Amino acid sequence: LSGLFRGYQAIADECAKDGVSYTDYLKRLLDYELECRAHNGRQTVLKMAGFPTLKTLEMFDFKESAVNKAQITELATLRFIANAENVILLGSSGTGKTHLAISLGYLATQQRYRIRFFTAADLLLQLEVASSQNRLEQYLSKIIAGSRLLIIDEFGYVKLNETQANLFFQLVNKRYETGAIIITSNLIFTKWQEVLNNDEALTAAILDRLIHHSHII
């Protein structure tokens, strides 16, 4: 009840000034405590998200972008998270993909969804470390599957070797139809095979799982 200890005196003074009943005073105290808990919860999941910087949809200039605003507005309802659907943001550098990904992630934290943000390079490094320490399944279950939304930024800038490509498949497969993914890439889908160790079958399997139940922007 930390909120009560911090705010009870100010609320008591306010209630005395307003001449409210003792019952109303208790109600204001409880409302304040609940709001403090909600705020603390939002701050906790925001910190855990790991955003490199904070971006919001209000900061995005739709007039200077080819992005469909109506489509983003629909995504901002966060129904895609509840439905374990994916969002794939494609485009060249500087088109606002990362901004939109972080903005949607920020909205999710305000609803107290557990989310994680990674660049593709950082995520693959962590997957490799976990695999080398024989704790890949634990990592996938706790960090990856344990988040309602996983954001993978900058996929396609670095080519993956065979081990990395297989680890990426395991990650995508782990979340398939169970958790939402937002992924940004500078490459159209026909170029993904070049990044995924030129493995045609693996690329097809990854794209099949990502594109199924997805919103492509």
State where each predicted segment sits.
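Interdomain "pre-motor" coupling segment immediately N-terminal to P-loop NTPase/helicase cores
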Residues: S2-T53
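Solvent-exposed alpha-helical segments within well-ordered globular domains of core cellular machineries
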Residues: R6-Q9, D24-R28, E58, T73, ...
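Short hinge/gating elements
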Residues: G7-E14, V87-L90, G156, K191-Q193
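Extended interfacial segments that mediate partner engagement and assembly in macromolecular machines
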Residues: A38-A82, N86-L90
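Conserved P-loop
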Residues: V67-A145, V195
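Walker B motif beta-strand of ABC-family P-loop ATPases
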Residues: L149
